[in-house]
């Protein structure tokens, strides 16, 4: 099915811009780490598109762990899903015991999706990407820290990527790119309700 490939190609402007900015600010066109949230995967596909074949770049995809990946209330498709069909293409899908698509759960509407793009499934299957699950509380905590220290209100989707940072280890010289997509002002009620 062409839809996932079309989305990835159109969103590739993200990684094209990353290449330009990294060359300008770092003197090279690639980071050591790329970190992106992943639901259906448009933001993540665009973030990694130009770097899939560059083995110097470590790719980290962050799923919505909801109330915990073992709680039955998450959208952690790569952690808990299995191969299936959704929207006309084969990929990893959250399914019940009979193979029916299962309702996902995430505090973030943008990550509340029962499937994953085929590119992301391939990156996970081949080990090209590391997969991290971040639960609702971790995402909100990370978002509130960004607000406190930098004055940036991230969207709930990107807050999951931020929530992965304490779970990863970097060297001081590493160039780390984490994509913040969306606008957090639309999520302000969720953030205020978490206090």
Give short role names for the model-derived ranges.
Residues 4, 11, 15-17, 42-49:
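Conserved PLP-enzyme active-site core in the AAT-like
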Residues 147-179:
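C-terminal structured "cap/appendage" subdomains that terminate the fold
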Residues 30-43, 59-62, 175-180:
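A short, small-residue-rich loop immediately preceding and capping a beta-strand
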Residues 1-6, 12-14, 25-28, 53-56, ...:
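Active-site/ligand-binding loops adjacent to catalytic centers
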Residues 24-37, 46, 50-54:
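Glycine-rich cofactor phosphate-binding loops and adjacent beta1-alpha1 units
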Residues 8-13, 172, 180-195:
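Glycine/aspartate-rich loop-and-adjacent alpha/beta segment that forms the canonical ThDP
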Residues 13-25, 161, 167:
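Phosphate/ATP-binding catalytic cores across multiple sugar-kinase/actin-like superfamilies
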């Amino acid at each position: 099915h062409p839809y996932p490939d079309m989305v990835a190609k159109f969103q590739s402007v993200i990684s094209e811009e990353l290449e330009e900015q990294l060359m300008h600010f770092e003197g090279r066109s690639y980071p050591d780490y790329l970190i992106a949230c992943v639901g259906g995967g448009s933001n993540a596909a665009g973030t990694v598109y130009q770097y899939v074949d560059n083995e110097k770049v470590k790719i980290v995809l962050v799923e919505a762990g909801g109330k915990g990946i073992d709680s039955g209330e998450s959208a952690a498709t790569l952690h808990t899903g299995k191969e299936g069909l959704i929207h006309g293409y084969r990929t990893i899908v959250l399914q019940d015991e009979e193979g029916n698509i299962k309702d996902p759960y995430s505090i973030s509407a943008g990550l509340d999706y029962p499937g994953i793009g085929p590119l992301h499934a391939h990156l996970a299957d081949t080990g090209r990407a590391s997969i991290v699950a971040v639960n609702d509380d971790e995402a909100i905590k990370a978002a509130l820290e960004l607000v406190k220290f930098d004055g940036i209100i991230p969207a709930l989707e990107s807050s999951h990527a931020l929530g992965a940072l304490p779970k990863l280890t970097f060297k001081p010289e590493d160039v780390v790119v984490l994509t913040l997509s969306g606008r957090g002002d639309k999520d302000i009620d969720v953030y205020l309700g978490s206090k």
